[in-house]
Amino acid sequence: MDTPDYKRVVLKLSGEALAGNDGFGINPSVVNLISAQIKEVVELGVEVAIVVGGGNIWRGKLGSEMGMDRAAADQMGMLATIMNSLSLQDSLENIGVATRVQTSIDMRQIAEPYIRRKAIRHLEKGRVVIFAGGTGNPYFSTDTAAALRAAEIEADVILMAKNNVDGVYNADPKLDENAKKYEELSYLDVIKEGLEVMDTTASSLSMDNDIPLIVFSFTEQGNNIKRVILGEKIGTTVRGKK
C-alpha cells in the first residue's frame, strides 16, 4: 500500500473549480470528479479538511466595485461558499465518504457550527470536514480561511488545487509564453514579489505557523491530489519558516 507523506491536510478548492468549463455555477460532473479523487485520498488513511471558495457564484469584491457595501457583499460571498460546500458534501456522501460541513456562520438547520475540537474529532474518525463560510468575517478571503483552519487543526500542509494552472509562475502563463514556473519558493518570496498565490494575510498566517503550501492543477490527467499526498513533486511548493 502507498504511504502518504501527510497525515492531515487542508484542501483549498476555488469556487471556479466547481464550475469547470461552464465558468459559472456548479457543474455536477466536475464536483463528482473532485469527490472521486478525494475518496481515493481518504482511503489512504489521510485526514482531509476542505475549504471551498465561492467565486463561481459571487465575489464580494465585485459587489463592492458595483457600489455595494463591502461587508454585505462579502457576506453574500460567504453564503456562496456554503452552497458549494453542501454540493460537495452531497457528492462525497453519494460515493460513501462520511462528510460534515461546519459553517463559520451559525445556521444549525443546514450544517454544524464550526467547533475546532469537534472538527478534529471528525477527522480522527475518518470523516471529511468541509469548512464553509470563510472566516465568518468580511474583508477576509477563503485563502485566509484555509490558512486559519489549517493552523487551528494543526494540518501538515495546505493543498491548493487550481483550475487550469499547474503551479506558481512569475507571470501569467496564459498571456506570457516566457513565464517561469517555480518549483519551490518561500512565503517571503511570495510576499516580496507580489506573486498571485494567496493574499498577503493568508501567506503571512501560513508563514508564521510554518505550514507549507503546494499549488497544483487537478484538471490534468490522473489524481493530482493523491499524487501530491504520496510525495510526487508536481506543482509548486511554498515553504514555511524552514
Swiss-Prot record:
Record's subcellular location: Cytoplasm
Enzyme Commission identifier(s): 2.7.4.22
Binding positions (ATP): K12, L13, S14, G15, G55, R59, N163, Y169, D172
Reaction catalyzed: UMP + ATP = UDP + ADP
A GO term for molecular function: UMP kinase activity
Reported regulation of activity: Allosterically activated by GTP. Inhibited by UTP.
Pfam families: AA_kinase (PF00696)
The keyword Cytoplasm is assigned to this record: yes
Broad enzyme group: transferase
Pathway named in the protein's UniProt entry: Pyrimidine metabolism; CTP biosynthesis via de novo pathway; UDP from UMP (UMPK route): step 1/1
Cystine pairings recorded for this chain: none
Chain sites annotated for binding UMP: G54, D74, T135, G136, N137, P138, Y139, F140, S141, T142
Major location (coarse): cytoplasm
Matches recorded under InterPro entries: AceGlu_kinase-like_sf, Asp/Glu/Uridylate_kinase, Uridylate_kinase, Uridylate_kinase_bac
Keywords: Allosteric enzyme, ATP-binding, Cytoplasm, Kinase, Nucleotide-binding, Pyrimidine biosynthesis, Transferase
Involved in allosteric activation by GTP as annotated region, ranges: 20-25
Gene3D superfamilies: Acetylglutamate kinase-like (3.40.1160.10)
Cellular component GO terms, alphabetical: cytoplasm
Family annotation (SUPFAM superfamilies): Carbamate kinase-like (SSF53633)
GO biological process, one term: UDP biosynthetic process
Subunit and interaction comment: Homohexamer.
Record family assignment: Belongs to the UMP kinase family.
Name of this chain's protein: Uridylate kinase
Species of the source: Listeria monocytogenes serovar 1/2a (strain ATCC BAA-679 / EGD-e)
